[in-house]
Amino acid sequence: MKNRVLSLLLVGLLSVGVATAAVKPEVQPVSTPKRVLFVGNSFSYYNNGIQNRVSNLIKSAGKWQAGDNRYRLKTISGGKLFEHIAGIPPLLQNSQKRQWDVMVLQEYSDGPISKKYHQSFVDSSDEIAILARKQGIEPVLFMTWAYKNDKDMTQQLADAYTAQANKLNALVVPVGLAFALAAQTNPEIELYIPDIDGFNETGQEQYNDVLKHPSVAGTYLAACMFYASFYQQSPEGLAYIADLPSAEAKRLQQIAWLTFQQFYKG
């Protein structure tokens, strides 16, 4: 009964424009990649890496095929996509056969909406997409989330990522919209973890006021969103919960699936 009430609440929030994108995706998820390379920064590598969390969901669903499935990560701490460009060709050309089905591109946290870096985001993702497709690899954009105390970023990031994905004729995975929906419906679930700025004279940790990096719950929600997008199936009921409280993981699974339904089908 509680799950049904939450479902109705989430659908209601989505229908009135909470956690939605003004720009609609033109590419629908229709295939299931087996070999996925994530390219990004700390948003992707925090909490043992998004690639491991998605892999564990796939294994939990009984869909992992040893020898066929491969999920890997290429990250630069604090990096932007343009900093990855030089390393892409040698990475893709060190084998006679195609190594990846999909390359997931994750830009710096506010890069797509920053006056300074927006064009860099566009140009870099354009260039990486060309390099990837020359090797038969499809680019996918990783829509990131707003900073915890700057909710206006949600709409801006959603539109920037979706517009660029449409331009590239590529899939975009709406992780940022799932974060926004979770914050609306389950604010007790902490999706962020503070960054340490330094230490005071007594050795106590000093934290940055800007909350942007994902907690384990945040990374798990992102992983559920990728599972839903890559398999076009709900992660609800999967046994892998990343050591989160069971009820919390179930909510995040449900939020990911509802975000999927609204973003791609709404």
Q: What does each model-identified segment do?
A:
Residues 198-266:
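Conserved catalytic region of serine esterases and O-acyltransferases that act on ester linkages
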Residues 39-40, 142:
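Short hydrophobic segments within beta-strands
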Residues 19-21:
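Boundary at the C-terminal end of the N-terminal hydrophobic targeting segment
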Residues 9-17:
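Bacterial N-terminal signal peptides
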Residues 1-8:
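Bacterial N-terminal signal peptides that target proteins for export
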Residues 92-216, 228:
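Alpha-helical cap/lid subdomain in secreted, periplasmic
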